[in-house]
């Protein structure tokens, strides 16, 4: 049998709590109940009033109406005892619920014949908990003896003064001295109570310890087989990413923000001259889109304002670019066409764009040539010279090669 060395898991503790196996410091609960009763007794118990009620009921006699006489006694008892009993019950129930974390042990209510097993009874008789209870009982005997000695030294004058006290004060003095004795006993027993709670907590976790095989089995039952779930997750991610990869590869360019948003734009003037949102991803997926686009040679334009505007105005993938963003998108397309033409060493291709998308100065916005001044070509530029920010700044792409199409464009 494997040695149980692993700490109990949260599920193990929850299952044990449903069976009634929870950490219970019963002596601390008893201390709270006794302290509550001792402190509440002087306020709730008035012996003078109780004696007067007894005299009144006894003087009426039971000959005339025995039923009413018995009912009067029962009513007096409930009126005296009910508040005190309810207060002590609440003081004991609340700590017990806190210790069990407000878990109701439903399974422990069922009748269990295994509890009558004599073998288990012998094991409990010679268990560590039985030894702990035996030592605790001896310590309580010593605590009680110490309490009596200290009480006698402190209040012996008050005890002997009871013989000379007036009858009206006798009951009150008895209650005060009893409360003092109880509180003194609880104070002396406090170290034993703390030690008992610590040992009980250790034994509780010791009984619920698990071996490594149990931990693995519990993980498989709660989370499922790790290898199967990982494989399913990988297959799902591959199926999910293939569609996005295809959309990225078919896009004319990717506009980024630069790391939190990635928008793919696709234009086919032969069908519809309006740009189309083919990819719309954020955060980690946006970074993956940018990396895949760079690997496939799809231009990546880092334009914060344009990326945010398209993301805000085009809330869904596979939708047309908003009218407010068409001008900016077409400026990027014209710029990319000029960059590709410059890398090939030929004239820029004719861009089939709507009239409203032609680069022009409007509302204080410079035309494309001014907005992308770093990418403009001087008149004396030699043929085949690469535009700045287009591809590698060290070596332009050779004729006929794939143009380097990643750059920064701030429209």
Curated annotation (Swiss-Prot):
Residues 341-411 are annotated as: Disordered. Residues 370-404 have a biased composition (Low complexity). It is a multi-pass membrane protein. One of its GO terms (cellular component) is plasma membrane. The keyword Transmembrane applies. The chain crosses the membrane at residues 28-48, 80-100, 137-157, 175-195. GO terms for biological process: protein secretion. Its main location: membrane. The keyword RNA-binding does not apply. It is found in: Cell membrane. Keywords: Cell membrane, Membrane, Transmembrane, Transmembrane helix, Virulence. Pfam families: Bac_export_2. Disulfide bonds: none annotated. InterPro entries: BsaZ-like, T3SS_substrate_exporter, T3SS_substrate_exporter_C. It comes from the Bacteria. Belongs to the type III secretion exporter family. PANTHER family: FLAGELLAR BIOSYNTHETIC PROTEIN FLHB (PTHR30531), SURFACE PRESENTATION OF ANTIGENS PROTEIN SPAS (PTHR30531:SF14). Part of the bsa type III secretion system, is involved in the intracellular replication of invading bacteria inside the host cell. Probably necessary for the lysis of the vacuole membrane and escape into the host cell cytoplasm. This is Secretion apparatus protein BsaZ. It comes from Burkholderia mallei (strain ATCC 23344).
